[in-house]
């Protein structure tokens, strides 16, 4: 179904069965598959390919040569009906690739809302990207990676399978992330190691002075106290009872399977 207000360039191909919302703009030489749903106001600039079971929300801007919903690169994939979901108001720049999920990983690759995926960024199968994240040029997420809200991943950075990038994290460019990065942390290097708290980013997002002090104290317990990881977790949990900002650390520890960067 194609809304009558949608614009489809004469050179674009929109296959029967696709659902195209109001005021969608599909530019020259785009290809939209039969199981694709594109929400109101989304723009496909030109030469964009969207296929598979892919649902795109409203008011996204998708630039030339982006590929969304293509078959993933997991060698176990055997053509199962897996999906991609993308939220609203994302900017997906040139040559970005977002692959469909796998049955083993839950069958869904998901990108939230208000994100910026810069040129040539790659989101592999079964990844979850939250809201208001930035993946800089050539940033690469391997399969099953989780990127939490407000995280920034620098250019040319690669993130290992199953890693977690916590909320408000900043990962420097040209890094290799092989373990989980706790929330609020600055990480850099190959393999990435912690370099303090992302204080400037947190200030811009309105964190209170008291909250910033509590986050710094949690960071010091984890990385500067000389305590074991289990000891640090216990003291951070006590700190979280008084300071809600620190709960992000305890929730991170519950999810972490690869262990925090050290």
UniProtKB/Swiss-Prot annotation:
Transmembrane segments: none annotated. Its EC number is 2.3.1.129. Keywords: Acyltransferase, Cytoplasm, Lipid A biosynthesis, Lipid biosynthesis, Lipid metabolism, Repeat, Transferase. Pathway: Glycolipid biosynthesis; lipid IV(A) biosynthesis; lipid IV(A) from (3R)-3-hydroxytetradecanoyl-[acyl-carrier-protein] and UDP-N-acetyl-alpha-D-glucosamine: step 1/6. Its main location: cytoplasm. SUPFAM superfamilies: Trimeric LpxA-like enzymes. It catalyses: a (3R)-hydroxyacyl-[ACP] + UDP-N-acetyl-alpha-D-glucosamine = a UDP-3-O-[(3R)-3-hydroxyacyl]-N-acetyl-alpha-D-glucosamine + holo-[ACP]. This is Acyl-[acyl-carrier-protein]--UDP-N-acetylglucosamine O-acyltransferase. The lineage of its organism: Bacteria, Pseudomonadati, Pseudomonadota, Gammaproteobacteria, Enterobacterales. The gene is lpxA.
């Amino acid at each position: 179904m194609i809304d009558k207000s949608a614009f489809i360039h004469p050179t674009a191909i929109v296959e029967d069965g696709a659902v195209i919302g109001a005021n969608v703009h599909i530019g020259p030489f785009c290809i939209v598959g039969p199981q694709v749903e594109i929400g109101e106001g989304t723009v496909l600039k030109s030469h964009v390919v969207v296929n598979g079971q892919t649902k795109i929300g409203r008011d996204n801007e998708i630039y030339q040569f982006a590929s969304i919903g293509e078959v993933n690169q997991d060698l176990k994939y055997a053509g199962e009906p897996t999906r991609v979901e993308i939220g609203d108001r994302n900017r997906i720049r040139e040559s970005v690739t977002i692959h469909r999920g796998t049955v083993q990983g839950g069958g869904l690759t998901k990108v939230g809302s208000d994100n910026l995926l810069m040129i040539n960024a790659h989101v592999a199968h079964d990844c979850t990207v939250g809201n208001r994240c930035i993946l800089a040029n050539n940033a690469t997420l391997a399969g099953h990676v989780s990127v939490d809200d407000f995280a920034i991943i620098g250019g040319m950075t690669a993130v290992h399978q199953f890693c977690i990038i916590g909320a408000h994290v900043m990962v420097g460019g040209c890094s290799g992330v092989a373990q989980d990065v706790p929330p609020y942390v600055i990480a850099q290097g190959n393999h990435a190691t912690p370099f303090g708290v992302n204080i400037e980013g947190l200030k811009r997002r309105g964190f209170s002075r008291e909250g910033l002090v509590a986050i710094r104290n949690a960071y010091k317990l984890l990385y500067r106290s000389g305590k074991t990881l289990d000891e640090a977790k216990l003291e951070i949990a006590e700190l979280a009872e008084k300071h809600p900002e620190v709960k992000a650390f305890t929730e991170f520890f519950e999810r972490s399977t690869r262990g925090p960067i050290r």
